[in-house]
């Protein structure tokens, strides 16, 4: 059993307190009663909202923890009357904002909160997170006294020595980015050699549908080639399609696979029939009652600690059939392989909201718009008024002053201190359609919603059906119910998020809520999501600039940000929000935020058979992956312009695919041939010869008892098939119509042989 010992003392008594773990790992940080912080959420209903500081720390598994607070300066203010916090409002159009709450529990002549330090331990496979809250303000309602810790030093000691070894993957990197003590972590980069398939970085689960599974394998190939070890499994292989069984399976995968997945994709629509879709948790605990039940919660499938937080990223492509799977996978691949070069697409992100004086809709989007404007973009604002007047005040909601102080003129200066800078309030759905048609890399809508609509400016699935935008957008739909992927049952009646993905145009990924959510909690989550995509957005949370802008990982990051905001209050609403907000799309989709540039790459065109390494020169920070026959053999990162990758000895005739990726850069793909034998005769292995290579027009295959030949593109799709070939001594295949590029040829004889060739 892990234990935590908490000591609180005044500076004058410091010498009388000897730390329990004096010679082991410890970490100290300073605390001030800072009113200008990103702890935006109010306290729980019926209690005063007070200043506090919440921080994440990485700690060794099974370590005992000691938390010390050395109070350097404190004060007491008399005759302070603090109002009780009202209950959080649901995002219903008929909602009246905050409602008063019972305050009787405060009047017992004790300080609230009762403890100066509150903590929660979050368990993971390699390490734990310790979430610590220091109450810099405490209140005695009977005496009307406000007790303030003006300065303090907090020290966390453990009984462990040395650094924590953590598997290097995108999810762990995301978690460590939010801790105050990242230096305790040593990321372990494990070698990736042929023949190791004990685990995967990325798990794709499909229904028992062969056609959908084939498209999952196409996505697997695309991700594997860029260095993300990917595995596809059907529900038949998992043996269950109930949410409890899926969760138990994913938990076993998380704790036992090597490598363990950082993300899982459910490539299928919601359905309890394993041939038609993939199930999810159907929750019956909505605070507003049965009218909003059941609601779907994919997040619970990966919430292994049952605390509302994901232990890995979960994403869903809601494909109800093979056609939809094809469309969604192809959207992803086309977007990354051929990103748009139009500068206007990146220069004009779009925010849209309906002003409601009692809510934060307008703050949620304007803060994002202000950030974009301060970073050399010209945000396209599409706004309307639900409840006014929209002439001065940002909002009458509690804690609005904290939000404005932090993001306003006295803080980050993303927004002015009032809303008078906005004057256009008559936008409508046509304006939203035009923004999408013209191209915008990012669109957020913030208002009330229904299954098929955004409230104001009004926009519906009918508007989506009419879109012909060739440049796809990433869409954040924080509006209620717009991500209810159990709604309807056919293409004519699906939720707004699904419709964005199911048309040929629209969006390549969407974040949306599966039911009615709560104001302020969902706004805070949204700012957390945005901080992952643009890490300087909230400077006092997280300190990493991630290699890629993965919106699926941003969805998870936003939930960890929400958890610590005004921790430990409103925890049930935070869990509800985390369960409601879903990411629809490929888990490793990277969104482009600037006009892409080419990666400068130099590598040998050939290697000798038996080679075990290759040196590649490339722009620093580029991720490099080598694969043979769609199986990763090595990966690394260019540092100071170069990287040497090591692998098992390569065989004569093999073709190594080289893929480089980097945020806001074009994906680079090229080949390295493993030479040996007579180049004039081509690639030779056993009794099979393929020549010439590269080929201009006619490819020749020589061998005995060849029964079938398939030529596939680098997505694994069959382009040419030549059957019943065993009577010919040399088989000739016309390749003149093939676009120039890399291809694979699968030759079926007594065994199956796979070759690569270049056109």
Regions found by a protein language model. Give the residues of each.
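Intrinsically disordered, low-complexity peptide-like regions
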Residues: 8, 15, 283-284, 296-297, ...
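C-terminal outer-membrane/trafficking sorting elements
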Residues: 21, 684-691, 695-759
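Ser/Thr/Gly/Pro-rich low-complexity, disordered linker/stalk segments of secreted
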Residues: 680-681
């Amino acid at each position: 059993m892990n234990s935590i010992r908490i000591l609180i003392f005044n500076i004058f008594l410091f010498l009388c307190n000897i730390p329990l773990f004096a010679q082991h790992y410890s970490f100290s940080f300073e605390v001030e009663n800072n009113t200008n912080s990103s702890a935006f959420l109010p306290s729980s209903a019926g209690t005063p909202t007070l200043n506090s500081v919440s921080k994440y720390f990485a700690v060794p598994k099974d370590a005992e923890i000691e938390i010390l607070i050395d109070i350097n300066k404190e004060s007491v203010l008399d005759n302070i009357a603090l109002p009780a916090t009202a209950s959080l409002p649901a995002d219903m159009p008929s909602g009246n904002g905050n409602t008063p709450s019972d305050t009787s529990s405060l009047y017992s002549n004790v300080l609230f909160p009762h403890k100066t330090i509150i903590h929660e331990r979050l368990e993971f496979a390699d390490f734990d997170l310790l979430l610590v809250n220091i109450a810099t303000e405490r209140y005695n309602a009977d005496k009307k006294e406000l007790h303030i810790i003006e300065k303090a030093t907090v020290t966390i000691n453990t009984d462990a020595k040395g650094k924590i070894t953590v598997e290097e993957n995108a999810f762990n990197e995301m978690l460590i980015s939010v801790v105050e003590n990242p230096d305790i972590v040593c990321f372990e980069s494990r070698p990736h050699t042929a023949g190791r398939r004990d685990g995967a970085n990325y798990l794709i689960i499909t229904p028992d549908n062969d056609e959908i599974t084939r498209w999952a394998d196409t996505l697997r190939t695309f991700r594997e080639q860029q260095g993300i070890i990917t595995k596809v499994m059907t529900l038949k292989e998992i043996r269950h399609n109930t949410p409890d069984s899926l969760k138990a399976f994913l938990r076993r995968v998380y704790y036992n696979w090597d490598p363990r997945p950082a993300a899982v994709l459910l490539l299928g629509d919601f359905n309890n029939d394993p041939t038609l879709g993939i199930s999810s948790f159907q929750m019956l605990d909505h605070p507003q009652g049965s009218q909003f039940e059941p609601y779907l919660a994919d997040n619970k499938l990966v919430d292994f600690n049952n605390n509302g937080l994901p232990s890995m990223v979960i994403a869903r492509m809601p494909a109800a059939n093979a056609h939809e799977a094809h469309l969604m996978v192809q959207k992803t691949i086309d977007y990354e392989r051929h990103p748009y070069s139009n500068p206007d697409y990146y220069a004009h992100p779009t925010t849209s909201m309906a002003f409601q004086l009692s809510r934060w809709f307008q703050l949620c989007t304007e803060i994002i718009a202000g950030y974009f404007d301060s970073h050399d973009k010209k945000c396209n604002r599409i706004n309307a008024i639900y409840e006014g007047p929209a002439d001065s005040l940002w909002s009458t909601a509690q804690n609005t002053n904290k939000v404005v102080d932090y993001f306003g003129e006295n803080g980050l200066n993303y927004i002015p201190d009032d809303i008078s800078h906005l004057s256009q309030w008559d936008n409508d759905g046509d304006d939203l359609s035009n923004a999408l048609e013209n191209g915008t890399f990012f669109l957020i809508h913030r208002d009330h919603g229904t299954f098929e609509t955004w409230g104001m400016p009004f926009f519906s699935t009918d508007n989506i059906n009419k879109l012909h935008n060739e440049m796809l957008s990433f869409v954040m739909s924080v509006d209620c119910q717009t991500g209810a992927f159990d709604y309807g049952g056919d293409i004519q009646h699906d939720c707004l998020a699904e419709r964005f993905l199911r048309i040929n145009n629209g969006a390549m990924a969407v974040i949306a809520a599966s039911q009615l959510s709560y104001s302020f909690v969902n706004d805070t989550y949204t700012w957390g999501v945005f901080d992952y995509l643009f890490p300087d957005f909230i400077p006092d949370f997280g300190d990493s600039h991630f290699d890629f802008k993965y919106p699926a990982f941003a969805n998870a990051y936003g939930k960890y940000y929400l958890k610590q905001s005004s921790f430990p209050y409103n925890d049930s609403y935070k869990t509800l929000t985390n369960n409601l907000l879903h990411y629809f799309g490929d888990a490793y989709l990277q969104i482009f935020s600037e006009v892409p540039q080419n990666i400068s790459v130099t590598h040998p065109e050939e290697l000798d058979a038996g080679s075990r390494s290759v040196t590649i020169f490339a722009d620093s920070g580029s991720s490099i992956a080598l694969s043979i026959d769609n199986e990763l053999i090595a990966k690394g990162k260019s540092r100071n312009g170069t990287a040497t990758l090591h692998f098992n000895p390569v065989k004569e005739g093999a073709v190594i695919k080289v893929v480089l990726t980097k945020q806001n850069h074009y994906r680079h793909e090229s080949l390295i041939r493993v030479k040996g034998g007579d180049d004039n005769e081509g690639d030779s292995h056993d009794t099979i010869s393929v020549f010439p290579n590269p080929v201009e027009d006619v490819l020749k295959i020589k061998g005995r008892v060849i029964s079938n030949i398939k030529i596939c593109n680098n997505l694994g799709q069959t382009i040419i098939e030549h059957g019943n070939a065993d009577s010919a001594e040399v088989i000739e295949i016309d390749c003149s119509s093939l676009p120039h590029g890399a291809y694979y040829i699968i030759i079926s004889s007594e065994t199956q042989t796979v070759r690569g060739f270049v056109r």
